[in-house]
Amino acid sequence: LPLDLPGVVAETENGMPGRSHRTMLAPIVSSPRALSVVTKYWMKKYDRKPDFIVAEGPLAGGHLGFKREELDAYTPENYERELTAMIRQAAELGIPLIAAGGIYDRRDLEHCLSLGAAGVQLGTRFVTTEECDAAEAYKQAYLSARKEDIVIVKSPVGMPGRAIQNAFLEKVAAGERFMTG
């Protein structure tokens, strides 16, 4: 959790004479408990609330803020209860909440808004756009991927991550090491 982010940003802002605005901060959380821990800590230690909160669900791409067993136990109904609880918590604090993770189309967007989210964040959906500076081969991997190609891997930080099955992941699974030093 980004518990000390306000302190890091304050140090940077204090070193910039003439700066007349503060940096907006938006922690990414994955549960009502994480939202509570971050907001209480920030308010107590830094007298600062997040400008908005991103609640990232278990269907997100990339690194995930969930344990493997939490992903295995995921159901849309369970997560909707969690998201609704986070929306309620954030509203009580006067903080807008942005829903993220697994938002695929307009129906998903409208559903999140109907639950009370202030907005949605999409990431994976934009990887293949012209504006994204990813390599064409990387974009093509997304476009060519089938549902069964999407796998859960253990990220370098030990948390689960969602990835497209490829030769690199197969080498990692076989025990090949890529880091030196």
Regions found by a protein language model. Name each.
Residues L1-L93:
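Active-site entrance/lid segments in N-terminal catalytic domains of soluble metabolic enzymes
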Residues P50, P58-I98, Y104-G181:
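Conserved active-site-proximal phosphate/metal-binding subdomains
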